[in-house]
Amino acid sequence: MNTDKNLEHLVDRAERIGVVGSPSSTTAVTLDILAPAVNKKLVGELALFRFLQDELMHYALGQIVEVTMRNVWHEDPTMLSLIRQRGRVDPVSERQDTHQGEMTISAVFAAKGRQYRPSILGTVPATGTPIHLVSDEVLSELLSPYQEEIFYLGRVYGSKPLLPLWFKHFGSGPKGAGEAYHLGIFGKTGSGKSVLAKMILLAYARYPEMALLVLDPQGEFAKEARGDSVSGQFKLPMREILNHLQKPVKVYEVKNLILDRWELFAQILYESPFFEHLSIPKGENRQLAAEILAEKLKDKRIPLRDLYLKEKFDIAWHLLGKEDIQKVFYRSGEARARFQSMYEKANVDEFFTKYWLPVTQLFREDRRGAQKIESLLKEIFHLDQERRPLVVVDLSGEGADHALEKIDEVTLFSPEESPQSQPQSAPLFWNETIQLLILKRLLDGIRREAERAYKQNRSLNTLVLIDEAHRLAPREEPDNEEKKALRSILIDAARTTRKYGLGWLFISQTLSSLHREIIEQLRIFFFGFGLGMGTEFRALSELVGGRSKALELYQLFRDPHSSFDTASREYSFMTIGPVSPLSFAGTPLFFNAFNNPEEFRKANPLKSKEGILDQT
């Protein structure tokens, strides 16, 4: 055995900062700080002490959450009078100061040979027991059997050692958790949420048997997955690392998604300006008009994929001119007469190009690189693939603002039609409601695939990341039916999909505005800067419970953007849950996330099934 790697020897060599003081308990240990360590930064440091329990040597680790100083002589009324006169009293001031810290125990290991097993602090060690600072060497020795599973997102808060974390896939086996769990990342804009989420995605991307799906309302993850340059100081080469891991990556934009439901067609047509230019404002009448038109077109066995053709539009236009159809959405003769007047005056070709095509292109199947939502989901959840993919669905709508690529005119027109005066491309219709409808369609499909796999006794082993979760599943009642339906699906998914091997990673700017039922289902939390005041802090306090010292330490986090330059920014996080081998007691841990991509890559020699693929 190499004595340099012997834990006893490593602890002896570690810096001693204090001893166990009084009072102490099995949850919090008082630290009497030694004179040489008084001027060191100790808050946030990871510390360790040895003690004997059940005839086995144990090692207890925890973070120092508070340091206090007391001088009883300075509290004496007579001394206070002297201090007021002189400022200090040499025999008393400074020399009689006593410094104490509070150490919250997060993990305890029992040593048996070179095997270290999780244990508990079942007794309080004697006063005077030495307490040492933890080093990377000590952690490596303690966690040596699990070194391949360890992943690093940053360093211990305000310190140098790397904080070991682990992200296991949701399947069975030696590196699997055996079940899915849900994660949440919370913090203000600029707190480092997105960068942390990308690093976590890369941690899960190491597993070929695990699929990853990112629902991206802002388009940020899509840019990273494509390898495009992104704004910000932390430029993580995500696509390059994924290629090293041999993880298949696919990015789908709005123009790549083929919608495949008649109810979606009716809802999107309702949202579009189509009926508005026929004098039907938003409301019940327009909804009835969209629904009856979709129903009649479906009755005529017109495939959704062909609705963009001019001849199919002509059928739809003809249907709207029929009185029995108009009576469905306008009961009064006066209203029908007004509609008929607008209908007869309308420029049919303009309606086709400006208002019909942008909607119906969403359902067109021969768009270059396009795929049905149903096919996309089957690709993600195909469990027998040797390497399951990371799929990003870009719902930002950036691609929808531009015209589609020029397409073969024979696909737009029937042979007997002359295409000379007709458009050969059209922008896609897009707004926030369409985004919600597509998200709802995706979530419905995910839930069905999960239920199907569960009936076959198979685990999906999939993580779904969803950004802007506070907007999609708010605590307050949404103001329209689409938002209500989407929120309901997300709440149900958080409650039920874990048993299917389907986990969720929710990213939110706020904690108090995300629906309580989703928060209650989360197992792992990451809290960045920005939740230290008002309703956010109250919501955070409810989750952390009675750990007031941990909350006080969280409130010390500084705004990353208050730094003098980008290189010195600190992205601090508090984490709760079974995400670290140093926190099986559920105690909060604090760390500073990497602010340099090279540091991240150096700390994590990313591995896949075949071994180490990236050591740079």
Please describe what each predicted stretch is:
Residues 242-372:
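Helical/strand "switch-coupling" subdomains that flank nucleotide/phosphate-binding cores, especially
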Residues 183-187, 213-216, 390-394, 461-468, ...:
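Extended hydrophobic secondary-structure segments that form protein cores and membrane-embedded regions
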Residues 426-551:
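Conserved P-loop NTPase motor cores
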Residues 109, 218-222, 397-400, 470-471, ...:
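Conserved nucleotide-binding/hydrolysis micro-motifs of P-loop NTPases
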Residues 360-462, 472-483:
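Conserved helicase/translocase P-loop NTPase motor core
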Residues 565-616:
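Conserved P-loop NTPase motor module
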Residues 153-251, 538, 542, 594-596, ...:
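Glycine-rich phosphate-binding loop of nucleotide-binding enzymes
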Residues 1-184, 200, 458-460:
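Basic- and hydrophobic-enriched, low-structure N-terminal and domain-boundary segments
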